[in-house]
């Protein structure tokens, strides 16, 4: 059971896009099955290295993702069923920002999708950190959240969650096969099954 965390008055909250707002990895795996003959499933992604589950190199993975980004599947990707409702509820509590490690060339498609699915008011700002390839010059999500004063963050990547938690940010970690760990999580990381679960664990819901 997740500890209830008080929602601060007029908080600045942040969220990742992929696998938090949209089931991107699940959709990508379906693309790999249909177009690449892969037999991997979402449950095979036990670590945050998709290429290992697919049995390909990291460079091949990047090429597969680039191909996926051009498909009707990616253009048709829609948010999780509860995403729009929960984001509207969080908007009543404060301002929301998006941080994503998506490549720069997806900016336009990303803005279009967020506008289409959430409207213009939910996410006041969208930041592309460009740290997907461990670019040494890129700003990390933790650094960005610290700079902006984000106090609550929704994420699916365990490493990023730990970094943010270490900086004193409250993190709601979406429970996924790739972020499982035997280590005990810090008290300000809360593993949740869905966005609804995350919101319901925040005190002050009513």
Please report, for each region that a protein language model flagged, where it lies by residue.
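Short catalytic/ligand-binding loop motif for oxyanion handling, primarily in non-cytosolic enzymes
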Residues: 22-25, 30, 105-109, 161-163, ...
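Conserved acidic residues
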Residues: 11, 124, 151
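Active-site neighborhood of HAD-like aspartate-dependent phosphohydrolases
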Residues: 2-63
């Amino acid at each position: 059971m997740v500890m209830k965390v008080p929602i601060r008055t007029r908080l600045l909250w942040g969220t990742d896009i992929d696998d938090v707002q949209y089931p991107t990895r699940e959709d990508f795996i379906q693309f790999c099955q249909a177009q690449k003959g892969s037999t991997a499933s979402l449950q095979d992604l036990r670590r945050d290295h998709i290429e290992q589950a697919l049995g390909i190199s990291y460079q091949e993975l990047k090429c597969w993702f680039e191909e996926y980004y051009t498909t009707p599947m990616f253009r048709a990707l829609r948010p999780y069923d509860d995403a729009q409702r929960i984001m509207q509820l969080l908007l009543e509590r404060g301002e929301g920002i998006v941080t994503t490690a998506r490549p720069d060339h997806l900016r336009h498609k990303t803005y279009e999708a967020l506008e289409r699915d959430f409207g213009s008011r939910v996410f006041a700002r969208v930041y592309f950190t460009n740290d997907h390839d461990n670019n040494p010059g890129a700003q990390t999500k933790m650094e960005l959240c610290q700079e902006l004063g984000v106090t609550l963050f929704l994420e699916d990547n365990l490493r990023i969650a730990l970094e943010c938690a270490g900086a004193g940010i409250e993190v709601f970690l979406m429970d996924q096969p790739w972020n499982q760990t035997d280590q005990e999580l810090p008290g300000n990381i809360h593993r949740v099954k869905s966005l609804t679960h995350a919101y319901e664990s925040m005190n002050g819901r009513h």
